[in-house]
Amino acid sequence: MAPSELNCTHQNQHSSGYDGPRSRVTVVGSGNWGSVAAKLIATNTLKLPSFHDEVRMWVFEETLPSGEKLTDVINQTNENVKYLPGIKLGRNVVADPDLENAVKDANMLVFVTPHQFMEGICKRLEGKIQEGAQALSLIKGMEVKMEGPCMISSLISDLLGINCCVLMGANIANEIAVEKFSEATVGFRENRDIAEKWVQLFSTPYFMVSAVEDVEGVELCGTLKNIVAIAAGFVDGLEMGNNTKAAIMRIGLREMKAFSKLLFPSVKDTTFFESCGVADLITTCLGGRNRKVAEAFAKNGGKRSFDDLEAEMLRGQKLQGVSTAKEVYEVLGHRGWLELFPLFSTVHEISTGRLPPSAIVEYSEQKTIFSW
């Protein structure tokens, strides 16, 4: 669908009587969650007079088995046939394989790609985005640098020179795609007006979004829970039962909170009770892709690598938990914290073959007595 076909634009915006500036939104990423995000946003830009109707979605171009380009198929069918089959994205979503072209007119940028690609994407966009643009990261993960861990929102802010909020929550994408009720949390820093604009852009009757002034807390919840989900998958693969899984989730939540507050003392306790915290942890440990692949890893006795299982089971989607466990392990080792975080440490050591999957319950929590 070409932008010129969006005949609804003028009708909606002129009939509203709104004369102020209109924001343009681009979604950078088009996987499972990126496609669902575009669908949510596209529903609201049609209704909200302060937004242009069209939503651009940058697609990392792929050739489908049919020989067709993924971008062409999305624009012809209004459906991401590879990463979100069977779901219409909205007639105002336009897929674009050219990253710079996709973002050039946007003043609201939504980033939703695997976290390991973000530094490269940001470097490609340096000097190419509108002055005063706002960013929102839906990305779960961190970059580990010599000077310490760098959250993805900070990476975006530092490289692009723009403010970046985050959105995290108990959000299994396929359930939101079919409009099952769920919640999410926007984390912001100081500017509540911008946060409320993001809340407005994502909120629907089936997707409830709230905002909290705690970017690091919200983002770390979304990042660290994937490590705990890997542990939960090991428990499932070894058929250890619900009591064991509940214990692993509790210990994991405790380590999530402790790690977050050691890195960023400003992180708020209440953030862990938002959708981005305990709710996201529960849903990811019950139904997410990290749990699913970790279960298969444990059933195979750790004899098949996560890379092999990911390629076989996820149809091009990427795991986040294994790479995040590695990144967190590096931080723990560098700061001398390994013994303080036995669950996080053990997940990485199992994932890399240093320990068997059964080791997930073979450590002591005695040294994890934190004051918070």
Swiss-Prot record:
NAD(+) binds at G29, S30, G31, N32, W33, G34, F60, F117, K140, A173, R289, K318, Q320. InterPro entries: 6-PGluconate_DH-like_C_sf, 6PGD_dom2, G3P_DH_NAD-dep, G3P_DH_NAD-dep_C, G3P_DH_NAD-dep_euk, G3P_DH_NAD-dep_N, NAD(P)-bd_dom_sf. One of its GO terms (molecular function) is glycerol-3-phosphate dehydrogenase (NAD+) activity. It catalyses: sn-glycerol 3-phosphate + NAD(+) = dihydroxyacetone phosphate + NADH + H(+). Residues 1-23 are annotated as: Disordered. The gene is GPDH. One of its GO terms (cellular component) is cytosol. Residues 1-16 have a biased composition (Polar residues). Its EC number is 1.1.1.8. Keywords: NAD, Oxidoreductase. Substrate binds at K140, R289, N290. It is an enzyme of class 1 (oxidoreductase). This is Glycerol-3-phosphate dehydrogenase [NAD(+)]. The active site is at K225. The keyword Oxidoreductase applies. Belongs to the NAD-dependent glycerol-3-phosphate dehydrogenase family. One of its GO terms (biological process) is glycerol-3-phosphate catabolic process.
